[in-house]
Amino acid sequence: MKIAILSRDGTLYSCKRLREAAIQRGHLVEILDPLSCYMNINPAASSIHYKGRKLPHFDAVIPRIGTAITFYGTAALRQFEMLGSYPLNESVAIARARDKLRSMQLLARQGIDLPVTGIVHSPDDTSDLIDMVGGAPLVVKLVEGTQGIGVVLAETRQAAESVIDAFRGLNAHILVQEYIKEAQGCDIRCLVVGDEVVAAIERRAKEGDFRSNLHRGGAASVASITPQEREIAIKAARTMALDVAGVDILRANRGPLVMEVNASPGLEGIEKTTGIDIAGKMIRWIERYATTEYCLKTGG
């Protein structure tokens, strides 16, 4: 097969591993910067051009689209979909997962347990907002934040009011969430491919922090997950219609709680921690579906 990887930086670990895994299985691979793709949207002869040339047909596309370029990145991916390329995560699913509010609404609708969460743009009554989510301590986040950026733990009511008021001055959407103290700065990242959790790690925050993101200096170890956690991770990925997803789970006293569903999970931390060839599993998923179900679905 001919496979395109959409990424702004082909030197990143995940891109290199996906390229390597695809080549090892006999496929042709090209890494394309989605921002350098430009599209001819024409009912008679749609096409995609890249750095002065018309791109050939690709059997499959692997989107590694960063949050900052979601709008144009998913537009480029849609064009590949229009031309019959199988996407490892469809554009609509990526856009849905990037909308944190919509994601949580969809997960809640499916009965998937979440931390108690409030979202607001410009709260007129900060005190009522804090009461609504159960009071301090609580976590205040910018909806548009990623990798732990724009996330603050407010341990007292006064601190929570100050943080919310400060964020309100940024004219941003604010997410206010209960703090799961018993998780002790740890979460579980489940890597879902299709209908299987192929790997899981526990991420622990560095000392003095509560954010377990590896990009923020957190540490990782292999996690043994329960059948309930496995089921919830798969259900969360299905709810978001993602073939590949990183599902982040907190272990609370009342049971596992889904924190986030990531449409473009990094492979470095989880592959190096577990030793599992996740990139290879993603390529095998493409082999299974790019040549059968998707062609039937799109008429390709």
Curated annotation (Swiss-Prot):
InterPro entries xrefs: ATP-grasp, ATP-grasp_RimK-type, ATP_grasp_subdomain_1, RimK, Rimk_N, Rp_bS6_RimK/Lys_biosynth_LsyX
Record-annotated disulphide pairs: none
Residues involved in Mg(2+) 2 binding: 260, 262
Record: residues binding Mn(2+) 2: 260, 262
Cofactor note: Binds 2 magnesium or manganese ions per subunit.
Sequence positions that bind ATP: 141, 178-179, 187, 211-213
Entry cofactors: Mg(2+); Mn(2+)
Domain ATP-grasp: 104-287
Superkingdom assignment: Bacteria
GO cellular component, one term: cytoplasm
Pfam families the record matches: RimK, Rimk_N
Chain residues that bind Mg(2+) 1: 248, 260
Xref: SUPFAM superfamilies: Glutathione synthetase ATP-binding domain-like (SSF56059)
GO molecular function, one term: ATP binding
Record bears the keyword Magnesium: yes
Enzyme Commission number, as recorded: 6.3.2.-
NCBIfam families the record matches: PRK10446.1, rimK_fam
Family: Belongs to the RimK family.
Function description: An L-glutamate ligase that catalyzes the ATP-dependent post-translational addition of glutamate residues to the C-terminus of ribosomal protein bS6 (RpsF). Is also able to catalyze the synthesis of poly-alpha-glutamate in vitro, via ATP hydrolysis from unprotected glutamate as substrate. The number of glutamate residues added to either RpsF or to poly-alpha-glutamate changes with pH.
Record protein name field: Ribosomal protein bS6--L-glutamate ligase
Organism for this UniProt entry: Shigella boydii serotype 4 (strain Sb227)
Gene of this entry: rimK
